[in-house]
């Protein structure tokens, strides 16, 4: 079992990256949101989930930049009919908080994703509603990301992963300008990344 991997991103594709760890390239599947903070040459640390694909006799690695996304995948794959690939598709469309809210509010439209039929959506809502409400009430630091603030800070030259790690702590009800102002103060200790 692999708990996490740290390395340099060698290649970025539509649903995965190749992460170079001590000159070994690992194919790691990521959600679209996690892929947004990966670029060639960046150094990252990913939490890892391992999935054995018995039909193809292979093992696939799924990576996460935060524990919330990893926890969501673990919950989703416990639902009968939800594969790792399907769970990653869900996490590519919805943030963990959006997913939790969709389940708690029984929002079938939010969960409408390619490959998810009505029966599977109902099963996800039914099987996870109790578990999600417990997680939500126990996790006070769980906020969605302000994408406008992320984009603005990256355009100012700050590294994507540092921007993401900084902004994910802020409450969503803050104005974008306030988030940027607060993040700039926190990021001022970091060097500006002059590579585009």
Curated annotation (Swiss-Prot):
Residues 144-147 are annotated as: Flexible linker. It comes from the Bacteria. It holds the Pfam family RuvA_N. Residues 66-143 are annotated as: Domain II. GO terms for molecular function: ATP binding; four-way junction DNA binding; four-way junction helicase activity. GO terms for cellular component: cytoplasm; Holliday junction helicase complex; Holliday junction resolvase complex. Residues 1-65 are annotated as: Domain I. One of its GO terms (biological process) is DNA repair. Signal peptide: none annotated. It is found in: Cytoplasm. Keywords: Cytoplasm, DNA damage, DNA recombination, DNA repair, DNA-binding. Homotetramer. Forms an RuvA(8)-RuvB(12)-Holliday junction (HJ) complex. HJ DNA is sandwiched between 2 RuvA tetramers; dsDNA enters through RuvA and exits via RuvB. An RuvB hexamer assembles on each DNA strand where it exits the tetramer. Each RuvB hexamer is contacted by two RuvA subunits (via domain III) on 2 adjacent RuvB subunits; this complex drives branch migration. In the full resolvosome a probable DNA-RuvA(4)-RuvB(12)-RuvC(2) complex forms which resolves the HJ. The RuvA-RuvB-RuvC complex processes Holliday junction (HJ) DNA during genetic recombination and DNA repair, while the RuvA-RuvB complex plays an important role in the rescue of blocked DNA replication forks via replication fork reversal (RFR). RuvA specifically binds to HJ cruciform DNA, conferring on it an open structure. The RuvB hexamer acts as an ATP-dependent pump, pulling dsDNA into and through the RuvAB complex. HJ branch migration allows RuvC to scan DNA until it finds its consensus sequence, where it cleaves and resolves the cruciform DNA. Belongs to the RuvA family. NCBIfam families: PRK14600.1, ruvA. Has three domains with a flexible linker between the domains II and III and assumes an 'L' shape. Domain III is highly mobile and contacts RuvB. This is Holliday junction branch migration complex subunit RuvA. It comes from Wolbachia sp. subsp. Brugia malayi (strain TRS). The gene is ruvA.
């Amino acid at each position: 079992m692999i708990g996490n991997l740290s390395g340099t991103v060698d290649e970025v594709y539509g649903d995965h990256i190749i992460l170079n760890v001590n000159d070994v390239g690992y194919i790691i599947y990521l959600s679209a949101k996690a892929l947004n903070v990966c670029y060639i040459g960046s150094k990252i640390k990913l939490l890892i989930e391992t999935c054995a694909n018995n039909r193809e006799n292979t093992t696939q690695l799924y990576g996460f930049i935060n524990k919330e996304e990893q926890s969501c995948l673990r919950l989703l794959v416990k639902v009968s009919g939800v594969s790792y690939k399907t769970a990653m598709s869900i996490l590519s469309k919805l943030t963990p908080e959006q997913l939790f809210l969709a389940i708690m509010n029984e929002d079938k439209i939010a969960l409408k994703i390619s490959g998810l039929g009505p029966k599977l959506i109902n099963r996800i809502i039914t099987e996870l509603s109790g578990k999600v409400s417990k997680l939500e009430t126990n996790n006070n630091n769980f906020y969605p990301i302000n994408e406008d603030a992320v984009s603005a800070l990256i355009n100012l030259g700050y590294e994507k992963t540092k921007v993401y790690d900084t902004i994910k702590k802020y409450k969503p009800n803050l104005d974008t300008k306030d988030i940027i102002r607060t993040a700039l103060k926190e990021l001022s200790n970091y060097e500006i990344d002059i590579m585009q």
